[in-house]
């Protein structure tokens, strides 16, 4: 049975389809589409030489979501909210709420001090989800250290209501991320399932889903292609507009909705290669965002 439901999160009313139950009593979770500062990595200044004179701001990212009729925005570490004053954070929060946009936060380098600061920011901005990349420059905590830091943060997240989502990101395997969450064993600590990052540990999306889907609090969707390198020797993994690459997106979304224990956001990211000029890069980035949003909307 499929119904339309309305619900409110952090003052934002969202309407979307929900499949309540399948034959055999399988519960299917809700998901909703979000944009990220990594939907627009070049506009946010990720490239060392192709950098706009003015980088995209949080308000401009919210405006992009409005233009594309997307109700959720996730700020990642390429748009770090700890670089803004309290007054600026309040303005971003109020602007998003006034325009019906739910916000999610993101950080990397999970030291105890940085985690505490980002939980504070999330609480101040009425943000329900903090996505976390544990590692940073020169900082690679062990599984035991990650587990300890998260466990120590439990009183704070219980007080604020913020959910922590640890993202699979390059170094650890999907099984290790699942182990961390199971050891912490708290309903406000889960996983951000990234569709592509675990290629760095030679894990397929099927392996990632097997371990991580039950703990999913957010899905990072980025499609990819594999092609010959420019020299013709070796292979390169590159980004693809959603629905045109190798990621079996409909099957992944279906699996997550059946196996996640809670509702989750589906946040669009991009690994697009840069073009010959900044102008061409930004134009293609914009086109990919529009086409990817249209494709993913057709699946939700």
State the predicted function of each range:
Residues 2, 6-124, 254, 283-286, ...:
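N-terminal pre-domain/capping segments
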Residues 19, 88-191, 200:
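Active-site acidic/histidine proton-transfer and metal-coordination neighborhood
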Residues 38-40, 78-80, 106-110, 135-137, ...:
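Active-site beta-loop-alpha junctions enriched in small/polar residues
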Residues 152, 156-246:
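Acidic/histidine-rich catalytic cores of soluble enzymes
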Residues 245-259:
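A short, acidic, amphipathic alpha-helical segment used as a generic capping/interface helix at domain edges
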Residues 238-240, 268-278:
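Active-site clefts of carbohydrate-active enzymes
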Residues 31-37, 73-75, 103-107, 130-132, ...:
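Hydrophobic faces of well-ordered beta-strands that scaffold small-molecule active sites
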Residues 42-46, 138-140, 275-279:
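A short acidic, helix-capping loop that chelates divalent metal ions and anchors anionic groups
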